[in-house]
Each structure stands twice: as structure tokens, then as C-alpha cells.
């Protein structure tokens, strides 16, 4: 018999990277929130790599922070190394990456959760959903506790019917030998959800004392590290380096000789693995012309000797892993502390979701994170934040929030998932964003902080600082457009020292800054303004001026896209009644049920001719409706 254990506005199932963002956002918005987790000691656990950020992913962390989420704040307090990547390239692909101290990250996140006013945290295994009249009303745990809520968010990561694979060894488990969730997955199937099976893997961890670092290349952090969070004021300067080494022909021989022993290649593994984070077995088979592959040695924290062997994800037997490790320069005497393994798990086919991350089949039920077919902590956190905001909005009778593809990488990811689906673990890449010049590391706050403020996730004090920054940027651009720089000898000397061609005539400071050789500080030196502006404001002014033409073109593309997004598709549309649309397109449209013509145009199998017919049909319906009115 179940018992009523409490009533809430929002219940979050799981406390990984999606779960903590969901719970925190919902609670901050004023929703009475419950977060249930299998193990209170594993909140925000990092089961795989000890890092946050990187290309596209680092920008997602900035977006989370700009909206009022917490991943950026917590990693800023717990990193052992911080690096800005792609600094030699344009601002659209620059991204921050932090090496995390795993135990400290978890400790900081748990502290934040425990001290959030509207948030209750409980340890417990959720076995089934409470469904009444086709609407999700809560959850039931294995201890028969029934918790009721207006909205439920499931963020189970890789725990649903998780199975660990290593050679011929196979056993039910979540990451790091945690308990696995069986009944919740079965319950979702009972309610008609289409479930798929994915796989991910992790490499061995070795003892730092047994590594010969003299045979590797040092990878230090930045001298002046930047922050993920706009609220961080102090940086950690006591950084720990990572180290680079490589596989070789001997490593590849060991792997090739034992491929049939890998659960990846022996037929044991049924789940689809990640294309962009392949196992070492997969790399050797797919890229057999490559003589070597990079291996990064990444410390897992300040107070542990465990070192993560980035690049050697494997499901080979433990005995072969020892052999493989010892073939790598610097690791000849390395001792494995934890062996690598693959893990298979259940995921929900994401085309069953609305762009709010609420499920189409069960109103009131949301899903976020790896359960939706993604890979990576950052992708999970971004979805968790949006699911939390929308679940709270539903409970509090507020408008839902849907970020479009021009607003955020988070918007790109969610649109890809719910519109196109994915047949492998989805990873965010800069190439997935058609408007990536607008979705930069430096401007996440300008894109999203107004939204975070409107939904109650940004404090008044922070919003005041943000509006002042916006004003300073606009005022400085206006000021530079009014200042004329004449070609005096002093100015020509500055130009030559900067490697720029001499001025032929007087020019506005604004136009001069468009020259690639001239930074904001160089132009500022010419006009001797001595203004006290923050580095963030200077950076933003320079980028907006230098890339003005490209940004303008990108915004024109966005305007065209938004016209298609504004053409809403009626909820009761009958696709079978539309003459001329291809059969495959009708099937896909009925399955995805797009909200707009723009979303319909991005569905695989729906071609431009189908979109044109759909547009005409909708417009004719609108005309008929007006005539009848």
C-alpha cells in the first residue's frame, strides 16, 4: 500500500547535471520543489571525464549562467585548471574549458541544493508514475511513498536499465557501480513511450605516482583564467597541469589482436555509441590509417591520485587494458586504479517531446538530460534548466519558454532533439548552429539575461549590473563613432607598431577599429580617453564593431527564419487531408507534430515542396476562418 508522502509543485527524479539545474530553477522561480535521488552522496557526480566546457559546450555553460542556472558558478569554485580554447580563431568558436576537482564540484553543488529555500531533497528510488486521466500527477518510490505534483521531471541519466560491459563481463549497474533503475523504464513503456538503447563508455583511471611525466608534454592552464559565471569575481590561480601523450603502433596492435574480446565488437553491446566520443577500439577500426591518437592525462582532483586517461575509453577485458596502458609512453609502469567500461542504458526517443521538454503522451511529465538521447554534462544541464523553468511555469500558470536556434546553443540542441530525433548519443558541436556568429561565449548575457530576469532567476542586483553594462557598450560605440582620428606622426607610429598600414586621411575611431590589427586598447591609446571600462565592455565593443557586417547578415538570416517560426500550425490540423504532401512527410509530421512551419521544415523527410503545400493549406485555412468570422 502506498502512503501520501507530500504534495509539491514540481518533482525532479534524479540529481545529476540535468536534475540539479531543474530543481534549482523550479525552486528559484517560487515552485515548491522535491528532488529525489538514488544516493544523496552522488549529487552532480561526474561519472566520466573530469571537465566542463569545450567547443560549443563551454558556450552552453555560459548560457546556463546567463539565464540564472548554476553549473558555471559551481565549476568556477572547483576547477583545478581553466583554459580558453581556439584563441587564435574568431570569437564564434572560442570556448572556455575547465578541469574539475570532482569531489569539490559535488560538495559545492550539494551545498547549494541543501540551502535553496523552496527545495526539498530526499533519497529514494522512483519506480512508477502516478497517472490520472492521462495526466502525470506524481511518482511512487520503492518504499511505497506517493509524492504528488503538477509537474514531474525525469532526469535519470544512464541509470534506466543500466548495464556495465567489460569484455565478457556483464552486469546490471549504473555508473561507478551505483544502483540501477529497472521499474521506471518499464513503467514508461507501459504508458506507451518509445524507448531506445544507447551506450557510452569511460577509460581507465591510473595512479599518478606510477606515471612517468617526463615522457609526456605539459598542458598548463591560462595565466589569467576567465570565468564561466558572470557573477564570479575571484579566479583560482593555483592551477594543476594536464599532460599529453600518444598511442602508438604497439597500442594499436594490442587492440587489434583483441578486438573480438571487446563487448563493443563481440555482439554483447546492443546500444548505439557516441560518434563524437568513440572508444579507442572504434578509433583504431575507423581511423586505421592514423599512426597515433592523442591521450590526455587529467587529474580527477587536488586530493586524489586518480588520473583520468582521456582518449582511451574502452570495453576491453581488464587484463587487456593493463597491456594497452603499458604500451603508451609515460604509462609503462602505470597502475590502473579503476578499469574502463562501457555502459548501456535506456533513453526516450526525443521526438515524443514538445520544445518545452514536456512529453506529448503524458501532460505534466517532462524529461531532461541523457534520458533524451544526449551525451555530456553540459547538454544535460542545459536541458535540465529549460525543463525546470517550464515545469515551474506550468505549475505557476506562467507562459512556457522556448529558445529558438538564433538565441542559444540550448535552443539548437532542443530543436534538433524534438524535431529530428537522434539515432546516437547527441553531442553539441559549433557546426550544428547555423547562427554561431551570434551565439558566442562573450555575449551569452546579452542574449539571455533578460529572459532569466523575467522568470525570476536573476537577482535585482545582478540585473542592475547587466543593464549598466549594456548601456556602457552602446554609449562607447556612439562615442567612438563621433571621434575623428587624424593621420598625425604619433598616430602613424602607433599604426606601424601595430602592423597596420598608415592612415591616408582622417577616419572615425569607430571605423578604424574595424581593422583586424587594431585592438580596442590600441584605438583607445590614439584618442587618449582614459575611460574606466571593464574588460568585458571593451571586448564587446570591439567584437560588435569588427564583425558588424557579418553580424548584420546573420541577423537578416534570423529574420527570415523567424518569419517561418511565426507561422503557427493549428493543433487540430489533419495532415491526411492535405493533398500533395508526400506520404513519408505526412508520417513524420504526424509523429513530430511541429508547432510552426519553421520547425516542420527541419524535419528529416519533409522537403521544401511539402513545406510550400503546408504553407498554402494553413494560409487558406486562415482566410476561410476570417471569412467565416
From Swiss-Prot:
Q: Which GO terms describe its cellular component?
A: cytosol
| A single MF term (Gene Ontology) | flavin adenine dinucleotide binding
- Any one Gene Ontology BP term: tRNA wobble uridine modification
Locate the residues binding FAD.
Answer: 14-19, 126, 181, 370
As cofactor, the record names: FAD
Look up the domain of life of the source: Bacteria
Q: Where in the cell is it found?
A: Cytoplasm
Keywords on this record? Cytoplasm, FAD, Flavoprotein, NAD, tRNA processing
Q: Which Gene3D superfamilies match?
A: FAD/NAD(P)-binding domain, GidA associated domain, C-terminal subdomain, tRNA uridine 5-carboxymethylaminomethyl modification enzyme MnmG/GidA
The question of whether Hydrolase is a record keyword is answered with no
Q: Which residues bind NAD(+)?
A: 273-287
What is the role of the protein in this entry? NAD-binding protein involved in the addition of a carboxymethylaminomethyl (cmnm) group at the wobble position (U34) of certain tRNAs, forming tRNA-cmnm(5)s(2)U34.
Complex and partners: Homodimer. Heterotetramer of two MnmE and two MnmG subunits.
Family the UniProt entry places it in: Belongs to the MnmG family.
* Protein known as: tRNA uridine 5-carboxymethylaminomethyl modification enzyme MnmG
Organism listed in the record: Oceanobacillus iheyensis (strain DSM 14371 / CIP 107618 / JCM 11309 / KCTC 3954 / HTE831)
Amino acid at each position: 500500500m502506498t502512503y501520501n508522502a507530500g504534495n509539491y509543485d514540481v518533482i525532479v527524479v534524479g540529481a545529476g547535471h540535468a536534475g540539479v539545474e531543474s530543481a534549482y530553477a523550479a525552486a528559484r522561480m517560487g515552485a515548491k520543489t522535491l528532488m529525489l535521488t538514488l544516493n544523496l552522496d552522488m549529487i552532480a557526480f561526474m561519472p566520466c571525464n573530469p571537465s566542463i566546457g569545450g567547443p560549443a559546450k563551454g558556450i552552453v555553460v555560459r548560457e546556463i549562467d546567463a539565464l540564472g542556472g548554476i553549473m558555471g558558478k559551481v565549476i568556477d569554485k572547483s576547477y583545478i585548471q581553466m583554459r580558453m580554447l581556439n584563441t587564435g580563431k574568431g570569437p564564434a568558436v572560442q570556448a572556455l574549458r575547465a578541469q574539475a576537482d570532482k569531489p569539490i564540484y559535488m560538495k559545492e553543488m550539494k551545498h547549494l541544493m541543501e540551502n535553496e529555500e523552496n527545495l526539498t531533497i530526499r533519497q529514494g528510488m522512483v519506480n512508477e508514475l502516478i497517472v490520472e486521466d492521462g495526466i502525470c500527477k506524481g511518482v511512487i518510490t520503492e518504499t511505497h511513498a506517493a509524492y504528488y505534483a503538477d509537474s514531474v521531471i525525469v532526469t535519470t541519466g544512464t541509470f534506466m536499465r543500466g548495464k556495465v560491459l567489460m569484455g565478457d563481463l556483464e552486469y546490471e549497474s549504473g555508473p561507478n557501480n551505483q544502483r540501477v533503475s529497472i521499474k521506471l523504464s518499464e513503467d514508461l513503456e507501459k504508458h506507451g513511450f518509445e524507448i531506445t538503447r544507447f551506450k557510452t563508455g569511460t577509460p581507465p583511471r591510473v595512479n599518478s605516482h606510477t606515471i612517468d611525466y617526463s615522457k609526456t608534454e605539459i598542458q598548463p592552464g591560462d595565466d589569467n583564467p576567465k570565468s564561466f559565471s558572470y557573477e564570479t569575481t575571484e579566479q583560482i590561480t593555483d592551477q594543476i597541469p594536464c599532460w599529453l601523450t600518444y598511442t602508438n603502433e604497439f597500442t594499436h596492435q594490442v587492440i587489434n589482436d583483441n578486438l573480438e574480446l571487446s563487448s563493443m565488437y563481440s555482439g554483447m553491446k546492443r546500444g548505439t555509441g557516441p560518434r563524437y566520443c568513440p572508444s579507442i577500439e572504434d578509433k583504431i577500426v575507423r581511423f586505421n590509417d592514423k599512426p597515433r591518437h592523442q591521450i590526455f592525462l587529467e587529474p580527477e582532483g587536488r586530493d586524489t591520485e586518480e588520473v583520468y586517461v582521456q582518449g582511451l575509453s574502452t570495453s576491453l577485458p581488464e587484463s587487456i587494458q593493463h597491456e594497452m596502458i603499458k604500451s603508451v609512453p609515460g604509462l609503462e609502469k602505470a597502475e590502473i586504479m579503476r578499469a574502463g567500461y562501457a555502459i548501456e542504458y535506456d533513453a526516450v526517443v526525443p521526438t515524443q517531446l514538445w520544445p518545452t521538454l514536456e512529453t506529448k503522451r503524458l501532460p505534466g511529465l517532462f524529461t531532461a538530460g541523457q534520458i533524451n538521447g544526449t551525451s555530456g554534462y553540459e547538454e544535460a544541464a542545459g536541458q535540465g534548466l529549460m525543463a525546470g523553468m517550464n515545469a515551474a511555469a506550468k505549475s505557476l500558470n506562467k507562459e512556457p519558454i522556448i529558445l529558438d536556434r538564433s538565441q542559444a546553443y540550448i535552443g539548437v540542441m532542443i530543436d534538433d532533439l524534438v524535431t529530428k530525433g537522434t539515432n546516437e548519443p547527441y553531442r553539441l558541436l559549433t557546426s550544428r548552429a547555423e547562427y554561431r556568429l551570434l551565439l558566442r561565449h562573450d555575449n551569452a548575457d546579452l542574449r539571455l539575461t533578460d529572459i532569466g530576469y523575467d522568470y525570476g532567476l536573476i537577482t535585482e542586483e545582478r540585473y542592475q549590473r547587466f543593464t549598466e553594462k549594456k548601456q556602457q557598450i552602446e554609449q562607447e560605440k556612439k562615442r567612438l563613432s563621433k571621434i575623428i582620428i587624424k593621420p598625425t606622426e604619433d598616430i602613424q607610429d602607433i599604426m606601424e607598431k601595430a602592423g597596420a598600414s598608415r592612415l591616408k586621411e582622417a577616419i572615425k575611431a569607430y571605423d578604424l577599429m574595424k581593422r583586424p590589427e587594431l585592438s580596442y586598447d590600441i584605438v583607445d591609446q590614439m584618442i587618449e580617453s582614459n575611460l574606466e571600462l571593464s574588460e568585458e565592455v571593451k571586448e564587446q565593443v570591439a567584437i560588435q564593431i569588427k564583425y558588424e557586417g557579418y553580424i548584420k547578415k546573420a541577423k537578416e538570416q534570423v529574420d527570415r527564419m523567424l518569419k517561418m517560426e511565426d507561422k503557427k500550425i493549428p493543433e487540430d490540423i489533419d495532415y491526411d487531408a492535405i493533398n500533395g504532401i508526400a506520404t513519408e512527410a505526412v508520417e513524420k509530421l504526424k509523429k513530430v507534430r511541429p508547432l510552426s512551419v519553421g520547425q516542420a521544415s527541419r524535419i528529416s523527410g519533409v522537403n521544401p515542396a511539402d513545406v510550400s503545400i503546408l504553407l498554402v493549406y494553413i494560409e487558406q485555412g486562415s482566410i476561410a476562418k476570417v471569412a467565416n468570422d
